[in-house]
Amino acid sequence: MRKVRDIMSAAPVCMAPGESVSAAARAMKQQGIGTVLVLTDGMLTGLVTDRDITVRVLAEDRDPRTTPIGDICSSHLVVLDPDDDLVLASRLVRDHAVRRIPVLQDGTPVGVVAVGDLALESGATSVLSGMSSAAQND
């Protein structure tokens, strides 16, 4: 059975909660990702997504240059272990209505699993699989 480690995006981008939303957005653009993990003293304390930036900063007319990511990140997180199976990962995505799940090994972030990763794994006939493998808009 395939494991989370087989499909996760490794080496997640991590930032401190005091970093600006602008810095997080730049990192997302440079890395071609939609998630930055928020670490406090090396421990995962939050997750900020491109959607969080849109909904919690831009839509509320907050200044992304001065708003810290710690103020907008999600802090009630669902996490996976690299050795968890993909059935569990899919169930957590569905049950918690999340699109991205941090992967921790011994408390240290080692990756992120996105709903797109799971869709690609589900096979070429999946509509989500086709959407997930399409070229990104830049």
What are these regions (language model features)?
Residues 1-11, 49-79, 85-94, 112-138:
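Tandem CBS (Bateman) regulatory domains
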Residues 14-32, 80-97, 103-104:
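The conserved cystathionine-beta-synthase
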Residues 28-31, 36-52, 93, 101-116:
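A glycine-centered beta-loop-beta connector
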Residues 7, 25-27, 40-42, 60-62:
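Short hydrophobic/aromatic-rich motifs at helix boundaries and adjacent loops
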